[in-house]
Amino acid sequence: MPKFVIEREIPGAGKLSKDQLHAISQTSCGVVSEMGPKIQWIHSYVTGDMIYCVYIAPDEATVREHAMKGGFPANKVSQVATMIEPTTAE
């Protein structure tokens, strides 16, 4: 299945407390569980005013459905074309 990077504009995201991040994570996992095996949350990166999430899903519509059900912004959804890393240079 395709992998997607979701850009979520959340002012002050980098200052969210451990408890707030826990609650956000629980909400996301609950929606994933409700939607079934067609979507999987891999991980997220939290920065100053953004959260970048990586999901596996059949299509962008499924990713956006997850965001809507969870009450999360999904300002930009990009399908990953490929991944590179240091070993790509070898």
Mark where each language-model region is.
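Generic, well-ordered alpha-helical segments
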Residues: 20, 47, 55-58
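Amphipathic, hydrophobic secondary-structure cores in small proteins
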Residues: 41-52, 63
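A short linear hydrophobic-aromatic micro-motif
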Residues: 37-43, 76
